[in-house]
C-alpha cells in the first residue's frame, strides 16, 4: 500500500502516558516510525520540547538517528530543532553526521520557539535569552553554509580567512526546512528560498495569510527553484467517530492543561480521563479537539484532502494524537498506529 495525494508524513512528540517509562515511550515511537515506513509515508520528524512529563521528544537528532536505523526508506529528521537553543555549528555537525548515517534521508526542520518555559530556556542558552533569537535568520544562513561542501568562511580579526565545515567529506547534505506559524516565518522562508511548514497543529490562526506571503514573496534558490509547502495537523482516526473521540480525550485534556496553566502530567489513559470528568477542563479539551481531525476513516480522509486542496500544500504532516487504554502494551501505541493505517487505507481507496 502506498500513499498517493496528498503526500503524508509523520510528526512525533513521543508522548508519555501514566506508568510508562521514557524507554517504553521511545520504543513505541520507533515502532510507529516503522509503520509509517511500511505505509509509504514520506518522512518522520521529531519535535523539540523540554521538561514536560507527557513528552519525551527532547533531542530530535538523537531520535532521528534511532529512527533512521529502525527504518529502511522513510526520510527522518527534526520538526523541529529550536535553533535559539543551540549553536549553529553544533546543529550543522549533528545533521551532517545524520546524513552520513542515512544518506539522502535526512531533514533539518528549524524553528525559533523556545520549546519550554523561561527557566529551561535560560538553562539551554549560554549566550542570553534574547540574543540567539535576534540572530535567528543569520544562524539559518550559517547552518546552510556549514552543511555545504565548501563550508563557511570566517574573517578573523587578524584578517585571516578561517574555513569551517560540519563534516570532513560530505557526499550529500540534509534538506533544510523552516517551521513557523506566523507571517514572520513565512516571509523568512521565502527570502531564504527554503521549504516552509506551517505549524497548524498548534491551532494558530493565519494559515492562509502565511502561505500567501510565502508564495508571493518567494525567492528561488538553487535547491528549491519553486516554493514548497507543508501543513501539520493533529489527527485521531478510529473505526468509528465515537471511538476516535474517546481516543482523542487524553491528549486533548493534556493540551488544555498546558494552555490553562494547570500542572502538567503524564498523559492519562482513556479510562482515567473518562472516570474523572472536569467540566472546565473537558470544555477546554473539547475546544482543542475541535481544531483537530477526529473521525472515522472515510470522513477523516475527506477532510485531509479538502484541507490540502484548499490551501494547495504539497504535503500534510500528521501528528497522531490517539491515547491508549490501560491494558495496551507500554512499548507500543496501538491507537496512533491505527490512525496511520486507517487513514492511509482510506486515502488510497478514495
Regions found by a protein language model. Give the residues of each.
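An alpha-helical appendage that flanks or caps ligand/catalytic pockets
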Residues: 2-4, 129-165, 206-314
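Active-site mouth loops of central-metabolism enzymes
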Residues: 12-27, 79-89, 170-180, 238, ...
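A conserved active-site cap/scaffold subdomain adjacent to cofactor or substrate pockets
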Residues: 182-205, 210-211
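Glycine-rich, proline-tolerant flexible connector loops at the mouths of alpha/beta enzymes
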Residues: 43-63, 82, 202, 320-332
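Acidic (Asp/Glu)-rich catalytic clusters
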Residues: 2-4, 37-38, 65-73, 95, ...
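N-terminal beta1-alpha1-beta2 module of alpha/beta enzyme domains
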Residues: 1-74, 337-345
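Flexible, glycine-rich active-site loops centered on histidine and acidic residues
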Residues: 4-22, 84-151, 196, 335
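Hydrophobic faces of well-ordered beta-strands that scaffold small-molecule active sites
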Residues: 8-12, 44-46, 76-79, 106-110, ...
Amino acid at each position: 500500500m502506498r500513499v498517493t495525494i496528498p503526500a503524508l508524513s509523520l510528526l512525533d512528540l513521543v508522548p508519555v502516558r501514566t506508568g510508562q517509562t521514557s524507554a517504553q515511550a521511545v520504543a513505541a515511537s520507533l515502532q510507529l516510525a516503522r509503520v509509517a515506513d511500511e505505509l509509504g509515508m514520506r518522512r518522520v520528524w521529531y519535535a523539540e520540547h523540554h521538561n514536560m512529563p507527557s513528552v519525551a521528544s527532547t533531542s530530535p537528532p538523537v531520535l532521528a538517528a534511532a529512527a533512521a536505523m529502525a527504518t529502511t526508506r522513510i526520510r527522518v529528521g527534526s520538526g523541529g530543532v529550536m535553533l535559539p537553543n543551540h549553536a549553529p555549528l553544533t546543529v550543522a555537525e549533528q545533521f551532517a553526521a545524520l546524513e552520513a548515517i542515512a544518506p539522502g534521508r535526512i531533514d533539518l526542520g528549524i524553528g525559533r520557539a523556545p520549546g519550554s518555559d523561561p527557566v529551561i530556556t535560560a538553562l539551554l542558552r549560554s549566550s542570553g535569552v534574547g540574543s540567539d533569537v535576534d540572530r535567528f535568520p543569520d544562524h539559518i544562513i550559517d547552518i546552510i553554509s556549514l552543511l555545504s561542501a565548501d563550508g563557511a568562511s570566517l574573517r578573523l580579526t587578524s584578517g585571516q580567512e578561517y574555513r569551517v565545515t560540519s563534516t570532513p567529506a560530505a557526499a550529500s547534505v540534509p534538506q533544510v526546512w523552516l517551521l513557523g506559524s506566523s507571517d514572520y516565518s513565512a516571509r523568512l522562508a521565502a527570502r531564504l528560498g527554503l521549504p516552509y511548514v506551517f505549524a497548524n497543529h498548534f491551532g494558530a490562526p493565519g494559515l492562509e495569510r502565511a502561505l500567501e506571503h510565502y508564495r508571493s514573496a518567494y525567492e528561488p534558490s538553487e535547491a528549491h527553484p519553486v516554493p514548497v509547502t507543508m501543513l501539520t495537523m493533529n489527527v485521531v482516526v478510529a473505526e468509528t467517530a465515537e471511538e476516535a473521540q474517546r481516543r482523542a480525550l487524553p491528549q486533548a485534556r493534556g493540551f488544555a492543561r498546558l494552555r490553562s496553566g494547570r500542572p502538567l502530567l503524564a498523559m492519562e489513559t482513556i479510562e482515567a480521563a473518562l472516570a474523572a470528568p472536569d467540566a472546565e477542563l473537558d470544555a477546554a479539551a473539547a475546544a482543542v479537539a475541535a481544531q483537530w481531525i477526529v473521525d472515522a476513516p472515510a470522513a477523516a480522509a475527506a477532510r485531509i484532502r479538502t484541507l490540502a486542496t484548499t490551501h494547495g500544500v504539497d504535503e500534510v504532516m500528521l501528528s497522531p494524537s490517539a491515547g491508549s487504554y490501560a491494558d495496551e502494551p507500554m512499548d507500543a501505541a496501538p491507537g496512533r498506529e491505527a490512525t496511520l493505517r486507517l487513514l492511509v487505507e482510506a486515502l488510497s481507496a478514495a
